[in-house]
Amino acid sequence: MSSSSSVPAYLGDEDLTQETRALISSLPKEKGWLVSEIYEFQGLWHTQAILQGILICQKRFEAKDSDIILVTNPKSGTTWLKALVFALLNRHKFPVSSSGNHPLLVTNPHLLVPFLEGVYYESPDFDFSSLPSPRLMNTHISHLSLPESVKSSSCKIVYCCRNPKDMFVSLWHFGKKLAPEETADYPIEKAVEAFCEGKFIGGPFWDHILEYWYASRENPNKVLFVTYEELKKQTEVEMKRIAEFLECGFIEEEEVREIVKLCSFESLSNLEVNKEGKLPNGIETKTFFRKGEIGGWRDTLSESLAEEIDRTIEEKFKGSGLKFSS
């Protein structure tokens, strides 16, 4: 990809190490959406830059028992989950009720909760040990590809899953905003086909979801599995469940309500920092806020495309016990 591309650096192929280039040359590849090519590594498909971030993360990240790692597929409630858990963990340091300058009012959630593989791609020598404890971070890395220290330590993982149809549509619109030139001539029918074949950025989506689903059932004290839909429908109830899992101590009903209000889509999306700001990688913060709805896929997907995704869901999740709200 040329340097004149409108695609952000972390979706491109600039500044790759020799090690990454050597590995990439040996990996299966497919034509991509957003980027010219994606590569299969440990079962999932990635851009070259994100692949490099994953490799560095696997080598250098050392988890602590007190760490909290938020995991999602792309466009599955990442921004919202970051805000909610940041506010929860910091409710004593930054009380929502007593301050008009809460960090979330002046800083985008993505700057408050670092994205592991993104940080490692942009700053390979970044020192995560300098972050205050408990360290709160997020990743899109599959369970299989997590650094060994994450798996072997007592750190906590909160995984948020979203209905794949809404996830796809959110990613589709995100990509069109992010890189209008690269996505202009890529029909949605082709994108749905690639999504359902698993040959899509971050895919196969079912493998990513099921790895964490089974991990949460095998080790419920290590991995908490929440769904975007339940988080939207009963935010206060789910927040209490997250707080209990993270062993945050007693939390007042009023505290929960205040956190939920502060972190609501309406609140966050209307803040100046989330309407006019930019992240260090050049992405406009407003790109992360579209509708935040359940069932918004109906406005974008035709009946036949929705059925195509539904058939994939039925086939891939059969027997897992995992059901999706629509």
Swiss-Prot record:
First-tier enzyme category under EC: transferase
Result of knocking out the encoding gene: Hypersensitivity to NaCl and ABA in seed germination, and to salicylic acid (SA) in seedling growth.
Subcellular location: Cytoplasm
Classification via Pfam families: Sulfotransfer_1
Chain residues that bind 3'-phosphoadenylyl sulfate: K75, S76, G77, T78, T79, W80, R162, S170, Y228, R290, K291, G292
This protein's UniProt keywords: Cytoplasm, Transferase
Location of the active site: H140
Keyword check for Cytoplasm: yes
Major localization listed first in the record, in broad terms: cytoplasm
Tissue spec. comment: Expressed in the aerial parts of seedlings, in roots, leaves and flowers. Not detected in stems and siliques.
GO cellular component: Golgi apparatus
Keyword GTP-binding: no
GO biological process: brassinosteroid metabolic process; defense response; response to salicylic acid; response to salt stress
Lineage: superkingdom: Eukaryota
Enzyme Commission number(s) of this protein: 2.8.2.-
Entry-linked InterPro entries: P-loop_NTPase (IPR027417), Sulfotransferase_dom (IPR000863)
Any one GO MF annotation of this record: brassinosteroid sulfotransferase activity
Known partners and oligomeric status: Dimer.
Similarity comment text for this entry: Belongs to the sulfotransferase 1 family.
Main function: Sulfotransferase that utilizes 3'-phospho-5'-adenylyl sulfate (PAPS) as sulfonate donor to catalyze the stereospecific sulfate conjugation of 24-epibrassinosteroids. Preferred substrates are 24-epicathasterone and 6-deoxo-24-epicathasterone. Low activity with 22-deoxy-24-epiteasterone. No activity with 24-epimers catasterone and brassinolide. Sulfonates salicylic acid. May be involved in detoxification. Enhances plant response to pathogen infection and contributes to long distance signaling in systemic acquired resistance (SAR).
Name of the protein: Cytosolic sulfotransferase 12
Species of provenance: Arabidopsis thaliana (Mouse-ear cress)
Gene from which the chain derives: SOT12
